[in-house]
A protein has these predicted regions:
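Short basic coil micro-motifs at the edges of alpha-helical modules that engage polyanionic partners
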Residues: 42, 111-114, 159-161
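Structural signal for conserved beta-strand scaffold positions within catalytic alpha/beta enzyme cores
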Residues: 41, 81, 146-147
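Mobile beta-alpha loop/short-helix "lid" or hinge segments that flank ligand
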Residues: 139-145
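Metzincin-family zinc-dependent endopeptidase catalytic domain
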Residues: 47-139, 150-152
């Protein structure tokens, strides 16, 4: 009897029973946030800019099926406001071409260079994607992760929702699983 029980246990464990398989599409099943990202936002952002940052975080939270969650307070992510592009120079050799930069636990945004509210939100969604480990995506038009913010479709500037391609990129990087 003990031998039979051991054999069944070995068989079940080899089949992965009880293990959660990874999924490519976060919409395929409910997820859960394993670890909230504690963040702080520079006090120099005005209330409208802070609202765009909050909306961008919601895009990732909802678009990943809850696998990403942000919690105010903390230093996992620090979002800073810059007044001029040349302030990016210490971290970015191509600073003249950028309106934002993500490195490590920091996102720097050159606020005066972004006029349109939809563009601002799209820019923050893009930079949060980098913080989550996603690189530039050029194999589809419908993504926030283009190498140039002007390549982001206007529809994404207007309607803040995570495109399927960006959600799949998140799952490729973070190995999404289904909540039990």
């Amino acid at each position: 009897m003990l031998r039979r029980t051991t054999a069944v246990a070995c068989l079940l464990s080899s089949l992965g029973v009880g293990a959660t398989a990874t999924v490519r599409d976060p919409g395929a099943c409910a997820g859960e946030c394993e670890r909230p990202i504690g963040y702080s936002v520079d006090s120099r952002f005005d209330s409208e800019e802070r609202a765009f940052i909050d909306e961008a975080m919601s895009v990732w939270q909802e678009g990943t099926g809850g696998r990403v969650c942000f919690r105010p307070g903390g230093s996992d992510l620090v979002i800073e406001k810059l007044d001029r592009s040349d302030q990016l120079q210490p971290w970015d050799p191509d600073w003249t071409h950028h309106v934002a930069l993500t490195k490590g636990r920091r996102i720097w945004i050159v606020a005066p260079r972004v006029n349109d509210p939809g563009e601002y939100r799209a820019l923050v969604v893009h930079e949060l994607g980098h913080h989550l480990g996603i690189g530039h995506i050029e194999d589809t038009a419908m993504t926030y992760m283009h190498s140039a913010i002007n390549d982001t479709p206007g529809d994404l500037w207007t309607h803040a929702q995570l495109p399927e391609r960006d959600a799949r990129a998140f799952c490729e990087v973070r190995r999404c699983t289904c909540a039990l």
